[in-house]
Regions:
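Bacterial Sec-dependent N-terminal signal peptides
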Residues: 1-28, 160-161
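A short beta-strand-turn-helix
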Residues: 24-44
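Alpha/beta-hydrolase fold active-site loops
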Residues: 44-45, 128
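Hydrophobic beta-strand anchors of alpha/beta hydrolase catalytic cores
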Residues: 46-47, 76
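Conserved redox-active cysteine motifs that mediate thiol-disulfide chemistry
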Residues: 49-63
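Structural microenvironment flanking redox-active thiols in thiol-disulfide oxidoreductases
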Residues: 61-98, 112-115
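Short, internal strand/loop/helix patches
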Residues: 95-127
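A short, hydrophobic beta-strand/beta-hairpin element that forms part of a small beta-sheet core
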Residues: 126-140
Length: 161
């Protein structure tokens, strides 16, 4: 029994890295991410797909951080699509340096053709991309936001529809 508990503990925490008091959660498959989304939807979710190598993504991250701090009506989740071998060398140091407080997830599932259509059937796969889950509604945009006001307006309009 002790061995099973130890295995379960080690298995569970082997996918978590600490980032500024916030955990970087790693999901190996989209299905794991989808389960997490379903279990954490007590309020509207604003999910941004991004990567450290994507300049427009990095530019708009402060807007999502501000949204996370100022809009208590939503939960912001940042889903990194960085390259797996750069998680330790680039992603985690980036999150620490920028003091990212939003929920941060690394999605290791590289079978994009299987899960992109589950987010939105028209998603080409380019990032940044944002999806809002609000109860049974889903609103997807494949664009970057020019400023915080544009993002905040989009989110507020989306959650009141």
């Amino acid at each position: 029994m002790k061995a099973r508990l130890l295995f379960l503990f080690l298995f569970t925490f082997s996918f978590i890295n600490t980032v500024k008091g916030q955990d970087l959660i790693t999901f190996k498959t989209y299905d794991e991410l989808n389960t997490y989304i379903k279990e954490n939807n007590s309020k509207p979710l604003v999910i941004n797909f991004w990567a450290t190598w994507c300049a427009p993504c990095v530019k708009e991250l402060p807007y999502f951080e501000k949204l996370n701090q100022e809009n208590q009506n939503v939960k912001v989740i940042l889903v990194s699509l960085d390259f797996e071998k750069q998680v330790e060398s680039k992603l985690i140091p980036f999150l620490k340096k920028k003091k990212i407080a939003s929920t941060s997830i690394y999605l290791a599932d590289k079978d994009y053709n299987s899960w992109l259509p589950k987010i939105d059937k028209n998603w080409s796969g380019s990032i940044p991309a944002t999806v809002i889950f609000n109860q049974d509604k889903k609103i997807f945009v494949e664009q970057d936001f020019s400023n915080y006001e544009e993002l905040n307006t989009f989110v507020n309009q989306s959650i009141t529809k």
